[in-house]
From Swiss-Prot:
Name of the gene encoding the protein in the UniProt record: hemE
Family: Belongs to the uroporphyrinogen decarboxylase family.
InterPro entries: UROD/MetE-like_sf, Uroporphyrinogen_deCO2ase_HemE, Uroporphyrinogen_deCOase
Cellular compartment(s): Cytoplasm
Main location: cytoplasm
Keyword annotations of the record: Cytoplasm, Decarboxylase, Lyase, Porphyrin biosynthesis
Molecular-function annotations in GO: uroporphyrinogen decarboxylase activity
Cellular component, GO annotation: cytosol
Pathway: Porphyrin-containing compound metabolism; protoporphyrin-IX biosynthesis; coproporphyrinogen-III from 5-aminolevulinate: step 4/4
Protein purpose: Catalyzes the decarboxylation of four acetate groups of uroporphyrinogen-III to yield coproporphyrinogen-III.
Name of the protein: Uroporphyrinogen decarboxylase
Native species: Rhodopseudomonas palustris (strain BisB5)
Length: 348
C-alpha cells in the first residue's frame, strides 16, 4: 500500500509554486486577543516563564491552529531570548514591555559576552519538538529570531522607545562598538536558527521590526548585510533552509533587500506600494502580507475591502496571506474568523 505524499501549501509557495488559494497565518497569532492564551499566560506566571515552559509554550503555539486552521504555526517565543542567552538581564514589566541593562557606551559594549549559551534556550527547542509532534503534517512550523539591528535597538536603549533612536545614534557616534553588538548577534542568531531547524522548524523568519527607521546607507550596513550573513551562515550548514525576511518599513529598499540577502520570501507591511512589490519583488521571491492589523479591530466592510485588496494585489504571484505586522491585543476573534473565511473562499 503506497503512502499518500503530504504537501505543505506554505512550503510550496516559498519553494516556487503559486497556490490558487494562498496559505495564511498571522504574525503574533498566539496572543492576548485569545482567551485561551490569556488563561495559559496566567498559569505560566510571567511572560518569560511562558516562553521557557516548553509544554505551555507549545500549547499557546497550537491554540490559533486549533481555532482558525492556519497553514503555519510560529513557535511562541520572543526576539529577546538571544540577549538573555548572551547573559544579559532581560525582564518584562507588566504594561511596560521589555527591560534590559542598556549597552549605551563603548565601555559597556566591552562587557558583552560574545558566545551564546544555547543551553539556556533548550526550552524553546523542546517546545518546537512538542509542536512538531502534534501538528498536522501539512502544517508548516516556523522558527524565528530578531534581526541583529532590531535586537540591538533594545540592547542599546535597555527598552523599547517610540523611535529606537538610541541605537541609531550609537551607530553614528560609535560605529565600532555598535558593529561589535551586530557581529555578536549575527553569529548568535545563526547558531540559534540552526538549532531551531534541528528541533523541527520547517521555515525560519528574521524579524527586522525597526529596520525601516534607517536611511538607505545605514539600511544597507545594519539591516541588509547582517541579514545576508545570517542567511549565508545558516545555509552553509543547511543548504536547503527556507528563510523569510521581514524588514518592516523598508519600502523602496525592498528590491535591494531581497537581491542582496538571498531570502526565499519577504514579509511586507501595509504601507508597501503594491505595483513596486509585484514588479520588483514578487517576480523573484514569495511575498507575505500585508493586511493592516487595525482592520481586525474595525471589521465590517472595511475588513472585507482590505482582504480583497491584498488578494487582488498579490494573488497572481507567489503569495502567503498575512498581516503587515503583528495582530493587536484588542483585535476581534470574530473579525479574524471573517478574514479567514474570505481568504479561504478565494480562488485566483
Amino acid at each position: 500500500m503506497t503512502q499518500k505524499l503530504v504537501t505543505k501549501p506554505f512550503i510550496e509557495v516559498i519553494s516556487g509554486k503559486r497556490q490558487a488559494s494562498p496559505p495564511m497565518w498571522m504574525m503574533r497569532q498566539a496572543g492576548r486577543y485569545l482567551p485561551e492564551y490569556r488563561a495559559t499566560r496566567t498559569e505560566a506566571g510571567s511572560f518569560l516563564d511562558l516562553c521557557f515552559n516548553p509544554k505551555l509554550a507549545a500549547e499557546v503555539t497550537l491554540q490559533p491552529i486549533r481555532r482558525f486552521g492556519f497553514d503555519a504555526a510560529i513557535i511562541f517565543s520572543d526576539i529577546l531570548v538571544v540577549p538573555y542567552a548572551l547573559g544579559r538581564a532581560v525582564r518584562f514589566e507588566v504594561g511596560e514591555g521589555p527591560r534590559l541593562d542598556p549597552l549605551n557606551s563603548p565601555d559597556l559594549v566591552g562587557t558583552l559576552n560574545g558566545a551564546i549559551d544555547l543551553g539556556k534556550l533548550e526550552p524553546v527547542f523542546e517546545a518546537l519538538r512538542i509542536v512538531r509532534s502534534e501538528l498536522a503534517p501539512e502544517t508548516t512550523l516556523i522558527g524565528f529570531c530578531g534581526a541583529p539591528f532590531t535586537v540591538a535597538t533594545y540592547m542599546v536603549a535597555g527598552q523599547g522607545t517610540s523611535d529606537q533612536h538610541p541605537a541609531r545614534l550609537m551607530a553614528y557616534q560609535h560605529p565600532g562598538a555598535f558593529a561589535k553588538i551586530i557581529d555578536v548577534l549575527v553569529e548568535s542568531s545563526i547558531q540559534y536558527l540552526l538549532k531551531q531547524l534541528e528541533a523541527g522548524a520547517d521555515v525560519l523568519q528574521i524579524f527586522d521590526t525597526w529596520g525601516g527607521i534607517l536611511p538607505p546607507r545605514e539600511f544597507e550596513k545594519w539591516c541588509i548585510e547582517p541579514t545576508r550573513r545570517i542567511v549565508e551562515g545558516v545555509r552553509k550548514v543547511k543548504p536547503d533552509a527556507k528563510i523569510i525576511g521581514f524588514p518592516r518599513g523598508a519600502g523602496a529598499l525592498l528590491p535591494a533587500f531581497i537581491e542582496r540577502t538571498g531570502v526565499d520570501a519577504v514579509s511586507i507591511d501595509w504601507t508597501a506600494e503594491p505595483k513596486m512589490v509585484r514588479d520588483q519583488v514578487q517576480t523573484k521571491v514569495a511575498v507575505q502580507g500585508n493586511l493592516d492589523p487595525l482592520l481586525l479591530i474595525a471589521g465590517g466592510s472595511a475588513l472585507d475591502q482590505g482582504v480583497d485588496d491584498v488578494l487582488k494585489n498579490f494573488s497572481a504571484g507567489r503569495h502567503i496571506f498575512n498581516l503587515g505586522h503583528g495582530i493587536t491585543p484588542d483585535a476581534s476573534i470574530a473579525h479574524v474568523e471573517q478574514m479567514v473565511k474570505r481568504v479561504r473562499a478565494f480562488r485566483g
